[in-house]
Each structure stands twice: as C-alpha cells, then as structure tokens.
Amino acid sequence: MLHTRQINTLYLRKYTAMFTGIITGVGRIVALHDLGRSLHHGKRLTIEAPAGYLDDVGLGDSIALNGACMTVTTFSPESRQFTIDISAESLDKTSGLDQEGTVNLEKALRAHDRLGGHIVSGHVDGVGHISHFEQIGESWELRVLAPHTLAKYLAYKGSITINGVSLTVNKVADLAQGCEISINLIPHTVKNTALGSLQAGSGVNLEIDTVARYVERMLSAGLTQKDTA
C-alpha cells in the first residue's frame, strides 16, 4: 500500500503541475532546434541549469520557464542541460522563449512543499511590456503595461506572476488599451531571478491570480443568471 505522501505526489505528477512563483534557479536557453511538422513547427529548447539543479529531476517532470509550464524531454545532470519541446502556439503566446538568453526556472510543487508565493498554474494568460524600470534607493520600481483582457483581474495588493515570479501589485492605473501596474522589487528578487535583465520595452509573461479568475467567473455567471431570470 502506498503512503499518503506517495499518493499525493503521484496525483500531482499524473494530472497537473502547480507552482508557487518562487524561482528555484536561473537558467539559460543555449540552443533552439526547429522541430518542423513533428510539432507543428515548434522548437526544441536546450536549457543550461545551475549546478546540482537537475539532481532530482526525471523525464516527464514539469519545470516552469519564465512562468510557462514545460515538460522535461531529456536531461543530463553531468552537462547541467535539459530539453523541452514547445509548440508554435505556445511560442506565439509567450515571451522570451524564442531566443537564447536567461530564464527563470521553477520545479513543480510537491505535495509536501511550502507554498511560499501564491498558487501558480504555469499557464501564461498574456504578454505584457515593461514601460518603466528604475532603481530607487535599494529597491527597483517595475511598471508593466498589461493587455485589456487582463486588466479586470489586476487589483491593488493583488498577486501577479511576471516571468514566473510571484509579485504584489502596488499600483494600478487604468488605460484605454489596458492598465499599467507598478511593482516593487527587493534586492533579493533582482539578484536571484532573471528580472534584473529586463529593460523598457521588454515583453514579459503574465499569469493572473487563480482566485481572481474564479471570482470574475462567478460574478459574470451570476449576472447572466439574473439577466435570464
């Protein structure tokens, strides 16, 4: 008979992957290979991970790259490299995965892990763009233009995932084309993630808070029911 801990871990690995938005390493995309028709013109990415990062990784495990959940297809702890296959659709709907460069890495949450950030699915909801990035004292102010499709989910002191990093929204300014959110980055975040390499104009992957998603759905469903009553 399996212990409860084993059952929970198997359940998570078989059915879904969850993350917390706490980056566990910074890697680098070192090669991209066109898969042609085998994956609808997607690509195979080779990522170099930090030393020791792949020691507990297995084939089929989920790792988030800049907030996008991907499946490990090959790995080598000796060379510190692993590969993932990404479809053309995913490349179109994300940012920073179509070229060589640094990426934030997070292994999927295990049943006994701490939930240090907030619940993150690894499904990118949209791409935002950096409008301002400036160091102020010992911290950094990061402003991101979010598309109008995501604006209704963003609120003061709410959670947002930017390139896989769980962050808190400090300000929200509504705009005609969406909204601009302001984030404060502490030195630890800048040092231990790839966010420090961003600059004005950079595209970033955004994932809204899961709770906000369900609240909006319940409210819209309630309004629809009233309209049809």
Question: Which role does the model predict for each range below?
Answer:
Residues 14-229:
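Conserved loop->alpha-helix
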